[in-house]
Swiss-Prot record:
UniProt-annotated stretches for the region G1: 15-22
Chief location bin: cytoplasm
Segments of this protein annotated with the region G5: 154-156
Species lineage: Bacteria, Pseudomonadati, Pseudomonadota, Gammaproteobacteria, Enterobacterales
Residues in KH type-2 domain copies: 206-283
GO BP, sorted A to Z: ribosomal small subunit assembly
GO MF assignments: GTP binding; GTPase activity; ribosomal small subunit binding; small ribosomal subunit rRNA binding
Keyword flag Ligase: no
Era-type G domain ranges (all copies): 7-175
Protein name from the UniProt record: GTPase Era
Length: 301
């Protein structure tokens, strides 16, 4: 008699900004769908990553980092997106960084204590901990904070113990029909993924120079007769000086960003891509909830 049981559930990946949530998601999926950079607050939307293996389907929600600073409209909305992800999942992966513990970590923990879902604590970047003797006392301190389902020291970057996290997730998926076909890796549209790729390259090549007041709008995304895609991306900044920074000397910076973004798009979409980028000043958008709604920042709240 064949066993036709299937298992499926939602898992939220939460934590303060820049602890490695997106890197962990990409590692769990075996490919990149969530943008990563060393700059905090890179993830702005909840990304759904789907991993299907045989009878098991894990649907991961990669939340923006929760943080205490809520002054700007964009930060308020990002915190709301992250908090709402915690409420409707079967399991939570709480990511913290090595032996660091901050008020933002404490704030996330307090939200999790109020929740019903079991929590796996993923202690990331353990390979970067200089004093290994500090690790065990810190893990004991963390264990005393909450009744975690499990505590797993990991390195999302190298993949250390990520398979352990995946095994714990699989073991706790409820019996349910799969929500997505087995070949799906995300429920986000190609248009959305294109904007995320461009935004990652902006973060990568402009780094600390560029404030968070930059976003990307895909104005055109069409199939062409060559079997590929024609994509027009609009980069929105808040000030004229930022526009010059993005364009670079004689257009060198935006050219590099475009070349690297196109490479990633072609790999993701498995088709040729013709990409054109423009930069436009739209002052105050990060403070304007209406502007944020028009850019899709509240479609998932």
């Amino acid at each position: 008699m064949s066993n036709d049981k299937s298992y499926c559930g939602f898992i939220a990946i939460v934590g303060r900004p820049n602890v490695g949530k997106s890197t962990l998601l990409n590692k769990l999926l075996g490919q990149k769908i969530s943008i990563t950079s060393r700059k905090a607050q890179t993830t702005r939307h909840r990304i759904v990553g789907i991993h299907t293996e045989g009878a098991y389907q894990a649907i991961y929600v990669d939340t923006p980092g929760l943080h205490m600073e809520e002054k700007r409209a964009i930060n308020r909305l990002m915190n709301k997106a992250a908090s709402s992800s915690i409420g409707d999942v079967e399991l939570v992966i709480f990511v913290v960084e090595g032996t660091r513990w901050t008020p933002d970590d404490e704030m996330v923990l307090n939200k999790l204590r109020d929740g019903k879902a079991p929590v796996i604590l993923a202690v990331n970047k353990v390979d970067n901990v200089q004093e290994k003797a500090d690790l065990l006392p810190h893990l004991q301190f963390l264990a005393s904070q909450m009744n975690f389902l499990d505590i797993v020291p990991i390195s999302a970057e190298t993949g250390l113990n990520v398979d352990t996290i995946a095994a714990i997730v699989r073991k706790h998926l409820p019996e349910a029909t799969h929500h997505f076909p087995e070949d799906y890796i995300t429920d986000r549209s190609q248009r959305f993924m294109a904007s995320e790729i461009i935004r990652e390259k902006l973060m990568r090549f402009l780094g600390a120079e560029l404030p968070y007041s930059v976003t990307v709008e895909i104005e055109r995304f069409v199939s062409n007769e060559r079997g590929g895609y024609d994509i027009n991306g609009l980069i929105l900044v808040e000030r004229e000086g930022q526009k010059k920074m993005v364009i670079g000397n004689k257009g060198a910076k935006i050219k590099t960003i475009g070349i690297e973004a196109r490479k990633d798009m072609q790999e993701m979409f498995e088709a040729p891509v013709h990409l054109e980028l423009w930069v436009k000043v739209k002052s105050g958008w990060a403070d304007d909830e209406r502007a944020l709604r028009s850019l899709g920042y509240v479609d998932d709240l």
